[in-house]
């Protein structure tokens, strides 16, 4: 039921990858404004040169769920009785981590007598991005470790106009960070970004794979790995000149981001939009925002992006999207509160939008 101020309040649980996030949000019944009450996150960080395995990540989420939930509740300043629903990430994501957090969400729902709402991870990113930036009806570029999609809203669905044909752009960057044995703290993609800022002297030729509004990153990763092996062996680059890890990171970023800008611009022309909203962990990258901004400015448009509190996986986006669905009457029965590693963005009926 609404709190003393008439607000609906939701607690959201996210754990589709290596970040465990729990957040609490309130919706103002008059203005419709979303108010972030708390947004707590804990990240599983693996050693340099390695990725995060599902079993280890799931173990981390199980170990930290209670303390993160307690902290989120304490920071929010609300009581358990004021919370209307418990929202959790249904998918897509890694099976083990998803399941660990879903079990935690079910436990809270049963302990507190609250209703459950399963949320699509991508829709959570989109709705949080719209709420924070004020973007009205943008073309959405969703870029993360597990997803790369160009999306636009139409007829109560977030339609996918283009996507990766193999691996996600974030996965490409993360895997190359392993090749160079770059630290995973705070995130491999962030550390590649910082290293790329030291490059720029050399732009190495890497495969550029765009097919209409779709793109591919496996070929460019393979070529970047080959060049890294040459560099470690002391061999010169294709032009006979030596190159550094910074040059490799710079070249990789410039190429993959140019691909993303191209397919986003094509989608903007197709749907007639002059707004771009960048969501997902890779959306924090300042160079991507800069390149996208230059393209949008040439079209008389604008780019919207959030900071790391909201573009990196978090619980508050799940709470927000879940509460939007809850307010339309959507519920997830306990016996249907499963998880799925495959959950397409356009499968969700977006009842809360016209």
From Swiss-Prot:
Keyword Transcription included in the entry's annotation: yes
Top-level enzyme category: transferase
Binding site for a divalent metal cation: 121, 125, 142, 313
Main location: cytoplasm
Keywords, alphabetical: Activator, Acyltransferase, Cytoplasm, Metal-binding, Nucleus, Transcription, Transcription regulation, Transferase, tRNA processing
Free-text remark on how the cofactor is bound: Binds 1 divalent metal cation per subunit.
Domain of life from the UniProt record: Eukaryota
Signal peptide: none
Metal-binding recorded as keyword: yes
Disulfide linkage: none
InterPro entries in the cross-refs: ATPase_NBD, Gcp-like_dom, KAE1/TsaD, Kae1_archaea_euk
Coiled coil location: none
Swiss-Prot/TrEMBL catalytic activity: L-threonylcarbamoyladenylate + adenosine(37) in tRNA = N(6)-L-threonylcarbamoyladenosine(37) in tRNA + AMP + H(+)
Biological process, per Gene Ontology: positive regulation of transcription by RNA polymerase II; telomere maintenance via recombination; tRNA threonylcarbamoyladenosine modification
Cofactor: a divalent metal cation
GO cellular component, one term: cytoplasm
Molecular function terms from GO: chromatin DNA binding; metal ion binding; N(6)-L-threonylcarbamoyladenine synthase activity; nucleotidase activity
Chain residues that bind substrate: 142-146, 174, 189, 193, 285
Location of the protein in the cell: Cytoplasm; Nucleus
Catalytic activity, EC: 2.3.1.234
UniProt record similarity statement: Belongs to the KAE1 / TsaD family.
Quaternary context: Component of the EKC/KEOPS complex composed of at least bud32, cgi121, gon7, kae1 and pcc1; the whole complex dimerizes.
Described function: Component of the EKC/KEOPS complex that is required for the formation of a threonylcarbamoyl group on adenosine at position 37 (t(6)A37) in tRNAs that read codons beginning with adenine. The complex is probably involved in the transfer of the threonylcarbamoyl moiety of threonylcarbamoyl-AMP (TC-AMP) to the N6 group of A37. Kae1 likely plays a direct catalytic role in this reaction, but requires other protein(s) of the complex to fulfill this activity. The EKC/KEOPS complex also promotes both telomere uncapping and telomere elongation.
Protein name: tRNA N6-adenosine threonylcarbamoyltransferase
Organism name: Neurospora crassa (strain ATCC 24698 / 74-OR23-1A / CBS 708.71 / DSM 1257 / FGSC 987)
């Amino acid at each position: 039921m609404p709190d003393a101020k008439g607000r609906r309040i939701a607690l959201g649980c996210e754990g589709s990858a290596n970040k465990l996030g729990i957040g609490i949000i309130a919706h103002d019944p008059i203005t419709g404004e979303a108010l972030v009450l708390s947004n707590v996150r804990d990240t599983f960080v693996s050693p340099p040169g390695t990725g995060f395995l599902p079993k280890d990540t799931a173990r981390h989420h199980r170990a930290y769920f209670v303390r993160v939930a307690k902290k989120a509740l304490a920071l929010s300043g609300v009581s358990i009785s004021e919370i209307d629903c418990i929202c959790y990430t249904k998918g897509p994501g890694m099976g083990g981590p998803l399941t660990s957090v879903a079990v935690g969400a079910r436990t809270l729902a049963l302990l507190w007598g609250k209703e459950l709402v399963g949320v699509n991870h991508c829709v959570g990113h989109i709705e949080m991005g719209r709420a924070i930036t004020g973007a009205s009806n943008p073309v959405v570029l969703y870029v993360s470790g597990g997803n790369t999609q160009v999306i636009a809203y139409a007829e109560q669905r977030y339609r996918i106009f283009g996507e990766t044909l193999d691996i996600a752009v974030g996965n490409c960057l993360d895997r190359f960070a392993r090749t160079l044995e770059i630290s995973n703290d705070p995130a491999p993609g962030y550390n590649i970004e910082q290293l790329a800022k030291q490059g720029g002297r050399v732009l190495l030729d890497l495969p550029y794979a765009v097919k209409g509004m779709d793109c591919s990153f496996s070929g460019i990763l393979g070529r970047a790995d080959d060049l890294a092996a040459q560099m470690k062996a002391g061999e010169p680059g294709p032009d006979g000149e030596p190159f550094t890890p910074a040059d490799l990171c710079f070249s990789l970023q410039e190429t993959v981001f140019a691909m993303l800008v191209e397919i986003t611009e094509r989608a903007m022309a197709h749907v007639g939009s002059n707004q771009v909203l960048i969501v997902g962990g890779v959306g924090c990258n300042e160079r991507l925002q800069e390149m996208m901004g230059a393209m949008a400015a040439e079209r008389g448009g604008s780019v919207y992006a959030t900071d790391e509190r909201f573009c990196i996986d978090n619980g508050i986006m799940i709470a927000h999207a879940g509460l939007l669905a809850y307010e339309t009457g959507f519920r997830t029965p306990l016996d249907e509160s499963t998880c799925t590693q495959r959950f397409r963005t356009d499968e969700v009926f977006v009842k809360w939008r016209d």
